[in-house]
Amino acid sequence: MAKTHEIKVERRADEGKGASRRLRHAGVIPAIVYGGELEPVSIQLNHEQIWLAQQNEWFYSSILDLNLNGDVQQVLLRDMQRHPFKQLIMHIDFQRVSANEKLSAAVPLHFINEASSPAGKSSEVVVTHELNEVQVVCLPKDLPEFIEVDLGALEVGNVIHLSEIKLPAGVEIPELKLGKEHDVAVVAAKHVRIEEDDAAGEEGSEGAETK
């Protein structure tokens, strides 16, 4: 069962640029909820509460419970506009989700056991994370906050592809249905040893220049 997080909201009475500007000056974020069989609803949220929430990974990848005076609607964050240089959220879009309809969402990847892997223990290997998130399709109840990628057995020269990620039950990666060329690398362990002869040659050149 996916975790949910409750956020209290209020209905927004006034709309337009002027009204939105006044809300922001009062520490309130203008927002909208759309999707499903209901009409779009203009809402407003406490800026301080959302500023703290958006610092957490779950805010972007989890089902959120919007509580409007006791009426709770399940939504996903679909867009968040920020001020270009101020610590200010300008506007938020939320999309309603239906318990019986699959949704598409970007889910973060958490890489574990890298340091203890054969590749991670080598000073001559660089482990690169080619992807930090993956687009999945699933029912709301199956949406994970993150997906773990276990690197414990990663060897020098190994590449882990998208198809090798262990997915939770009920979760699919639609990209993999588009063909083998879409089975991209997620992690690569590359050998980057510098030859001793090259290093010695560089030191000799530096010594000659200082004479």
Curated annotation (Swiss-Prot):
<keyword id="KW-0699">rRNA-binding</keyword>
<comment type="subunit">
    <text>Part of the 50S ribosomal subunit; part of the 5S rRNA/L5/L18/L25 subcomplex. Contacts the 5S rRNA. Binds to the 5S rRNA independently of L5 and L18.</text>
</comment>
<comment type="function">
    <text>This is one of the proteins that binds to the 5S RNA in the ribosome where it forms part of the central protuberance.</text>
</comment>
<keyword id="KW-0687">Ribonucleoprotein</keyword>
<dbReference type="GO" id="GO:0006412">
    <property type="term" value="P:translation"/>
</dbReference>
<dbReference type="InterPro" id="IPR037121">
    <property type="entry name" value="Ribosomal_bL25_C"/>
</dbReference>
<dbReference type="GO" id="GO:0022625">
    <property type="term" value="C:cytosolic large ribosomal subunit"/>
</dbReference>
<dbReference type="InterPro" id="IPR029751">
    <property type="entry name" value="Ribosomal_L25_dom"/>
</dbReference>
<dbReference type="GO" id="GO:0008097">
    <property type="term" value="F:5S rRNA binding"/>
</dbReference>
<comment type="similarity">
    <text>Belongs to the bacterial ribosomal protein bL25 family. CTC subfamily.</text>
</comment>
<dbReference type="InterPro" id="IPR001021">
    <property type="entry name" value="Ribosomal_bL25_long"/>
</dbReference>
<keyword id="KW-0689">Ribosomal protein</keyword>
<dbReference type="Pfam" id="PF01386">
    <property type="entry name" value="Ribosomal_L25p"/>
</dbReference>
<dbReference type="InterPro" id="IPR020056">
    <property type="entry name" value="Rbsml_bL25/Gln-tRNA_synth_N"/>
</dbReference>
<dbReference type="InterPro" id="IPR011035">
    <property type="entry name" value="Ribosomal_bL25/Gln-tRNA_synth"/>
</dbReference>
<dbReference type="GO" id="GO:0003735">
    <property type="term" value="F:structural constituent of ribosome"/>
</dbReference>
<dbReference type="InterPro" id="IPR020930">
    <property type="entry name" value="Ribosomal_uL5_bac-type"/>
</dbReference>
<keyword id="KW-0694">RNA-binding</keyword>
<protein>
    <recommendedName>
        <fullName>Large ribosomal subunit protein bL25</fullName>
    </recommendedName>
</protein>
<dbReference type="InterPro" id="IPR020055">
    <property type="entry name" value="Ribosomal_bL25_short"/>
</dbReference>
<dbReference type="InterPro" id="IPR020057">
    <property type="entry name" value="Ribosomal_bL25_b-dom"/>
</dbReference>
<dbReference type="Pfam" id="PF14693">
    <property type="entry name" value="Ribosomal_TL5_C"/>
</dbReference>
